[in-house]
Amino acid sequence: MRTQVIIEDHVLPQLLTSAIEAYEVSHRAHARGRSNKKLETFGLLWGYALPVRNGVPARLVAVVATVETSALRHTDWVRPDFESIAMKRDFFGEYWPQLELIGTFHSHPYEDLSEVNDTKGWRASEGDRAFWPDFHEFVCPDMDELAHLVIAITGLSRKGTAEPDRLAGNEYTSGYVVSADKRKLWIKGYTSALYEEVDEDAPFDEAFMAGDIEMGRSYDVYEDEDVLLEIPSLEARFRHELLRR
């Protein structure tokens, strides 16, 4: 059954501005250090994980986003610090226990529009697909599903006028594209899921009969028709100027 990934209104500016800042603003390790732009950024999604119930699909609802400022950032990759992630998870668990770590987001910066289109830059890379299951297993091993967002960004030569829209084809349910001044952004959603099955090599003994069954675990990535990304405020904020006044 398709999983709904819901991004609440106040989370959207956190996602977009973190990608824009990493793309447009110079970053230095110190005042006289080398300046870098068009970097990837990485962050975490916090909120609620609602299971399948009465025919309603599983939902991952993001209500807060935090940026991993300790992550190593490059134009082609980003590497989060897992100690930082563990610290934040403990901090939320202590003071906001009602919120769970439900996923990640990171950006894909591109030089121009043609590069994005040629490479389908809004899609997850092979590295992303390998990283998400490992992240799921290491950080949130008992979560049934996690959401993962890719935010692609590029600059435009003039102010974009295209209204926000869903991605085309079989990616329609899982992503959006939007113009914001002299930049264009794509947001595409994925999920990683935990699967448990009986270990075929487990002995058929008294413990097995008593329900103490060894389970094998694996984590896989899902996309497109298996993911429904919902950002209700995106179309309203970017389509209707009245809401921005």
Locate each region found by the language model.
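MPN/JAMM (Mov34/JAB) isopeptidase/deubiquitinase module and associated MPN-bearing subunits/adaptors
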Residues: 1-103, 107-245
